[in-house]
């Protein structure tokens, strides 16, 4: 086992604070509409330019192991806030640094860190309650666009495209971000339920111009096994042909004589039919087939539920207004399923999302839910260069998370003002002793810090602006984008309440842990010298060979 170094007391705390400050100082320059860029070196390829706090934090690893402990703890604040709310990482880092800085003044003066922590927790709980009271629900596309724009570092175009996407697919819909092919941002909306499986034979194509198979008002057969024998399928085909409707067959696979017969029927015009593979694998495939069944008002033909292909009737088949089958995608538009059944299915998926432990499972469940609830919107981010594209894409993703958070818990005035107004809730708050009162004072001072940093990044005097904002009330604040004071909600400077709340809670949680730290343990630095080479790079003092 490698030897360890141990630091105690003030020496340990000084090292942690040093690490906290190095990371926080690099992150906080990005805060606000006039925040600066940070350039991140890459071991290969072009450097990355970013204004995203968590991207900067993730890159920082300090040489001094004790300082690195402090940096990693604050990195945790940024990551946790990004996971919870998707944005607010820089605000969380600034708050954590402020609480640590103010807290260590009291620790150095001999205050009990455990009581300081209790005071901090008390103050944060009161501010969180006040933030909930201050927040108002987002009701208009304009508000959603404003939240998105602020989160994307005051880029109104990004705010607008996100608001349009939410308009199209609803608050429950899935919005994905992809690399675009042009210089401008584009929005692509897929209506209905789409899955990533296409036609099994190009002979099913009935629209050669678009290279798609289109079916109007088709029946939809859902089968969870492979179909190779046409005899199994004949009874259903005859019933569908009598009804005079087209047919979409979704099965684990269709091959052999079954596929050949379907192709021949299509070519001869006897029956308009398209066969596609069922999406997904294993249990996920069964779940998606069940989703399609509920959306189209049909049933999955499966032995498990006592249904067989030979005995299937038209009542077991689903229906949709329109189906489009491309080479790699199938889209079902306007399924005939009942609204109540779809709502019940969405609720059951919600319960699975809440219980999901892995991000992958959660993402796939949210995708299923969105396909049932509204549809899918794809934002294609355009830029002139690869470096700009990466930076812009990160901002779009941040803005998307922020708008979702705004829809979830409402909005509060931005620009650091919400925390200042919520501070009123703890002005008269008292702890159980004077040390807890000191913990409350730490938070009172720390909540000014986001506004101070926004102002400093805009090149103005922080103390003057904070004093002026505190003289006002309600939504009155400082708009760093234009240097004006006024009603921030009217000016569209908004923050999601969830982002502000998560930033404060995560910052206080980690900062309070740092304050109560009294010893640090880290691996001993390796003092071995580098392997000695020949002097002057080659034998006899000559340079080494050139290649």
Curated annotation (Swiss-Prot):
Disulfide bonds: none annotated. Its EC number is 5.6.1.7. Residues 528-547 are annotated as: Disordered. Residues 535-547 have a biased composition (Gly residues). SUPFAM superfamilies: GroEL apical domain-like (SSF52029), GroEL equatorial domain-like (SSF48592), GroEL-intermediate domain like (SSF54849). It is found in: Cytoplasm. GO terms for biological process: protein refolding. It is an enzyme of class 5 (isomerase). PROSITE patterns: CHAPERONINS_CPN60. It catalyses: ATP + H2O + a folded polypeptide = ADP + phosphate + an unfolded polypeptide. InterPro entries: Chaperonin_Cpn60_CS, Cpn60/GroEL, Cpn60/GroEL/TCP-1, GroEL-like_apical_dom_sf, GROEL-like_equatorial_sf, TCP-1-like_intermed_sf. CDD domains: GroEL (cd03344). It comes from the Bacteria. GO terms for cellular component: cytoplasm. One of its GO terms (molecular function) is unfolded protein binding. Keywords: ATP-binding, Chaperone, Cytoplasm, Isomerase, Nucleotide-binding. ATP binds at residues 30-33, 51, 87-91, 415, 479-481, 495. Forms a cylinder of 14 subunits composed of two heptameric rings stacked back-to-back. Interacts with the co-chaperonin GroES. Together with its co-chaperonin GroES, plays an essential role in assisting protein folding. The GroEL-GroES system forms a nano-cage that allows encapsulation of the non-native substrate proteins and provides a physical environment optimized to promote and accelerate protein folding. Belongs to the chaperonin (HSP60) family. This is Chaperonin GroEL 2. It comes from Azoarcus sp. (strain BH72). The lineage of its organism: Bacteria, Pseudomonadati, Pseudomonadota, Betaproteobacteria, Rhodocyclales.
């Amino acid at each position: 086992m490698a030897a360890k170094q141990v630091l105690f007391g003030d020496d340990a705390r000084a090292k942690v604070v040093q690490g906290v400050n190095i990371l926080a100082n690099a992150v906080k320059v990005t805060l606000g509409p006039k925040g600066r860029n940070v350039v991140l070196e890459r071991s290969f390829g072009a450097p990355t330019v970013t204004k995203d706090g968590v991207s900067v934090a993730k890159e920082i690893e300090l040489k001094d192991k004790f300082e690195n402990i402090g940096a990693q703890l604050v990195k945790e604040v940024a990551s946790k806030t990004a996971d919870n709310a998707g944005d607010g990482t820089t605000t969380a880092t600034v708050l954590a640094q402020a609480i640590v800085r103010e807290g260590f003044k009291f620790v150095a003066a001999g205050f009990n860190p455990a009581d300081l922590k209790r005071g901090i927790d008390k103050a944060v709980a009161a501010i969180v309650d006040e933030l909930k009271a201050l927040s108002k629900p987002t009701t208009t596309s304009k508000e959603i666009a404003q939240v998105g724009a602020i989160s994307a570092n005051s880029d109104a175009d990004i705010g607008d495209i996100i608001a349009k996407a939410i308009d199209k697919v609803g608050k429950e819909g899935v919005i994905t971000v992809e690399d675009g092919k042009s210089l401008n941002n584009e929005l692509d909306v897929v209506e209905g339920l789409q899955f990533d499986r296409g036609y099994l034979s190009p002979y099913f194509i009935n629209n050669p111009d678009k290279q798609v198979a289109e079916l109007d008002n088709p029946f939809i057969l859902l089968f969870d096994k492979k179909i190779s024998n046409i005899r199994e399928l004949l009874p259903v085909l005859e019933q569908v042909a009598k009804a005079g409707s087209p047919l979409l067959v979704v099965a684990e696979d269709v091959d052999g004589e079954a596929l050949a017969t379907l192709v021949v029927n299509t070519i001869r015009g006897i029956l308009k039919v398209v066969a596609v593979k069922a999406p997904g694998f294993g249990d996920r495939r069964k779940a998606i087939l069940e989703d399609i069944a509920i959306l189209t008002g049909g049933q999955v033909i499966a032995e498990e539920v006592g249904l067989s292909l030979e005995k299937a009737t038209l009542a077991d088949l689903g229906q949709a207004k329109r189906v489009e089958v491309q080479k790699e995608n199938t889209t079902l538009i306007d399924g005939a399923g009942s609204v109540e059944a779809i709502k019940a299915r969405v609720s059951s998926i919600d319960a699975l999302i809440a219980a999901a432990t892995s991000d992958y499972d959660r993402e796939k469940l949210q995708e299923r839910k969105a396909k049932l609830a509204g549809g899918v919107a794809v934002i294609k981010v355009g830029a002139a260069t690869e470096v700009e594209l990466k930076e812009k894409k990160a901002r779009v993703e941040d803005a998307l998370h922020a708008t979702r958070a705004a829809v979830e818990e409402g909005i509060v005035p931005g620009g650091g003002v919400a925390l200042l107004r919520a501070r009123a809730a703890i002005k008269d708050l008292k702890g159980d002793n004077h040390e807890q009162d000191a913990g409350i004072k730490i938070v009172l001072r720390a909540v000014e810090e986001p506004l101070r940093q926004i102002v400093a990044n805009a090149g103005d005097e922080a103390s003057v602006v904070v004093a002026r904002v505190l003289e006002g009330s309600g939504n009155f604040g400082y708009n760093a984008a234009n240097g004006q004071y006024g009603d921030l909600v009217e000016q569209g400077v908004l923050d999601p309440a969830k982002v502000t709340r998560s930033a404060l809670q995560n910052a206080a949680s980690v900062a309070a842990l740092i304050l109560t730290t009294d010893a640090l343990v880290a691996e001993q630095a390796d003092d071995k010298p580098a392997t000695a080479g020949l002097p002057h790079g080659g034998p006899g003092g000559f340079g080494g060979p050139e290649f």
